[in-house]
Amino acid sequence: MKRRRLIAALAVSALALPALAEWQPSKPVRIVVPFAPGGQPDLVARTLAEPLARALGQPVLVENRPGAGGNVAAEAVAKGAPDGHTLLVATNGPFAVSPALSRSLPYDVERDFAFVTMVGSSPSLVAVHPSLGAATLSEVVAIAKARPGELNYASVGKGSVSQLSMALLSAETGIETVHVPYSGGVQAVAALLAGDVQLLSLVPTALIPHVAAGRIRIVAQTGATRSPLVPDVPTVAESGFPGFAAPVWMALVVPAKTPPEAVKRLHAELARIIRAPEMKERLWDRQWIDPIGSTPEEAARVVREETAKWARIGRTLGIALE
């Protein structure tokens, strides 16, 4: 009888272990953003920080570490303490474009990071300065071909998707343009508004507010289908360049050796937050991010597929990053 009671007690204790062993942060958690303040990744991180802090019972701080198209922040987080207290906003540039097209990187996406969740995706828009005199992508191409090497395009940094989508567009349309990198979306948009550059491909958050004022024009969107945000603007493919698609996505990752229980807790809380109806309003209605809140495995799969896609593009068009 005593033996049966002991076995039953052990069974009950075993069932209670997962709840007792749930990971809990012991200090403030950081979300590192690989770009300057004010851009879409920064806004997304700050949107998630408050509800995540409530869920974890610890402050969640947002730290901006711009540089090298996001690679500076990626390297820093890869080499940081794998204790669950540091997350990185992972975007196309440092997590798919750079690994596919760079000859060498100070980090390896598959070796150095563990995925937590795919936050969401967003279309990119191709914007022009009104002084260019173009209202459609076809007109931009015609002007660029008449003035080879004279048109400049801004980006949020070398190796960013804002650079590579324009490089890809230039290659596929047969135009010659000059890349001018900036440290973030705010700086790139400021350059376009000032007329320092004529072209910019970036997420709607940064561009839409300036359209109504007539300070910029949107000539195309880079997604495979039209976004309901700008239903009257054709995709690049619809503008006469079939097969073109370069959407923007954002994931959250941690250093590779982060304890599985920490990854599990972070994923559970973040997926719940991202999928909540009120977060859909904050992400989509205000920032034009289509929220996902995927599993870690699904996020890793998307990044692998994106990396393979950019590698194919690089080989086909001869695009490489120094």
Predicted regions and their residues:
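N-terminal export leaders
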Residues: 3-8
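N-terminal (or domain-start) structured segment
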Residues: 21-111, 150, 158, 174-199, ...
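C-terminal lobe and pocket-closing loops
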Residues: 121, 207-276, 286, 305-308
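Short coil/turn segments
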Residues: 34-38, 92-93, 121, 129-134, ...
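Hinge/capping helix and adjacent helix->loop/strand transition within the periplasmic-binding protein
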Residues: 79-85, 100-187, 236, 249-282
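A ligand-binding cleft/hinge motif common to bilobed small-molecule-binding domains
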Residues: 94-104, 168-172, 199-233
